[in-house]
UniProtKB/Swiss-Prot annotation:
Top EC class, one word: ligase
Family under the similarity heading: Belongs to the ATP-dependent AMP-binding enzyme family.
Lineage: Bacteria, Pseudomonadati, Pseudomonadota, Gammaproteobacteria, Enterobacterales
CDD domains found in the cross-reference section: ACS
Protein name in UniProt: Acetyl-coenzyme A synthetase
Necessary cofactors: Mg(2+)
Keyword Cell wall biogenesis/degradation included in the entry's annotation: no
Chain's role: Catalyzes the conversion of acetate into acetyl-CoA (AcCoA), an essential intermediate at the junction of anabolic and catabolic pathways. Acs undergoes a two-step reaction. In the first half reaction, Acs combines acetate with ATP to form acetyl-adenylate (AcAMP) intermediate. In the second half reaction, it can then transfer the acetyl group from AcAMP to the sulfhydryl group of CoA, forming the product AcCoA. Enables the cell to use acetate during aerobic growth to generate energy via the TCA cycle, and biosynthetic compounds via the glyoxylate shunt. Acetylates CheY, the response regulator involved in flagellar movement and chemotaxis.
Keywords tagged on the record: Acetylation, ATP-binding, Ligase, Magnesium, Metal-binding, Nucleotide-binding
Amino acid sequence: MSQIHKHPIPAAIAEHALITPEKYQHYYQQSVQNPDEFWGEQGKIIDWIKPYKTVKNTSFDPGHVSIRWFEDGTLNLAANCLDRHLAERGDQTAIIWEGDDPNQSKTVTYKQLHHDVCQFANVLKSLGIKKGDVVAIYMPMVPEAAVAMLACARIGAVHSVIFGGFSPDAVAGRIIDSHSKLVITADEGIRAGRAIPLKKNVDEALKNPAITSIKNVVVFQRTGNASYWEDGRDVWWHDLIKEASADCPPEEMNAEDPLFILYTSGSTGKPKGVVHTTGGYLVYAALTFKYVFDYHPGDIYWCTADVGWVTGHSYLLYGPLACGAITLMFEGVPNYPGVNRLSQVVDKHKVNILYTAPTAIRALMAEGDKAIEGTKRDSLRIMGSVGEPINPEAWEWYYNKIGNSKCPIVDTWWQTETGGFMITPLPGATELKAGSATRPFFGVQPALVDNLGNPQEGVAEGNLVITDSWPGQARTLFGDHDRFEQTYFSTFKGMYFSGDGARRDEDGYYWITGRVDDVLNVSGHRLGTAEIESALVAHPKIAEAAVVGVPHNIKGQAIYAYITLNHGEEPTPELYTEVRNWVRKEIGPLATPDILHWTDSLPKTRSGKIMRRILRKIATGDTSNLGDTSTLADPSVVEKLLEEKQSMQTPS
């Protein structure tokens, strides 16, 4: 790989940092040696109605997996995110909303958000929603999505947020699995200038005869273009709140009462309903938000994630609002209407902390300096990356160009199932290496094990497991605890298996190498796809790459690389040879791709993750059953890749 050097902690950050290197060592030691004492103290970051006496009661034992934190305490999440801030910062902005159209933006104060949430909580009650009922939320990125989520939490209803890009079939599947009682949606969403037919998709989903639990659909008016309307079932948001009181006391919830269900794709294709509960989740979201982003009062924080993903739950809304932060919600995409939109939004709202995904960073990087044209970005202090491992070249570009070479990057590794950050730098405590998630957060005990579960000490590579529980951990899969145990605790007994591989370097830093099913075995050597992809993307003409293994009768697996070139570049036989030699030089002969497949589009989920399962099937010619493609942002990509594969000529 290209030489990785350490980025020291900038003096300007070190001076005011909440966590110093010494504090990190002290807290981390305490958190793993005496978790009850550590979390007993840290649990006070939020307000409890009835304080807890029991801190940790957890077991990873096969057949007895049980995760309980602060179990005798009671609280309300909405009261922690809203009510407790009113006296001190009621008039402070809670949410800055930036529309898809650059001319549309507004701010919502804590006082206003509290008013709107109480009002909508009463609407939910008037529609018969009770504590424990599940409410499906299928909304665009507007403040009302946050209002709906917080209103559910206020009355003890469980929300199941469905990303606004999912198809009617995917929506129906999630409504059926969770037994949702109500759907909250909008007439349409707007993204990159295009209308998203949310209400129409809900209408289509509700035609499924297996859905019997939905009595009403609440529709927020975003564009005014609602097509079909079913009287008696469909009700306008604005009509309902006219009648509603803004007085709604928060429901007292047990720490272990479910807060939300969030569906994540399973390897079998059937989505898994990950269940998070109230107390431990909020403690963990608030604490990780505060320390990982080194949040100081008044900082303007922008997480680009959609509310439909766990990042939108933990780090757009709940973590920031629990800490009384100012959080920016963005309806659009980072490159619309121009490729410098992300940079423009940073300047317009004087954003101090920016948290986005490698897929966005790589898309901007392909545009070069146009991505920062006419902008300064000098308000930025901290930047972050989430969603997948970020290759060192994209990390350095993000650091140098977007962050003006002065902002630490927190490259956070975590999952829907972990609730919050697991392995991550802390801005004032961690020297950075481009592409490394660095060290575990407090209370997180990672280990690397071989395929038999034997721990690998020191500098090593292996399966990434967590050996003990943390408060933000998911408790179960909705209605299927057996599948929860099977998926996460059966591969390596007594440990949580992340499904990811990682290596640990001489400094104890962790490098995520990708999903374990994305590890190639070439002539008996393990190669992480992330490493080969990083080498490919380091080539000056390559914008994006995805690597999969295909069977090879001598080497076991051959390396098949899908490659998207930068704008203006064309594939040639010469470039084919050049790229193969480039990887050979960067990593070694073993990692040389056997086949290059030029394409201008890769199959991505709506959260920007590349769907490698489909790429593997196309590469091996196994296209009879491509499985569930409903989560793809653009399903037509698959057909295009198949056509390209059929017409491919491999230079000799």
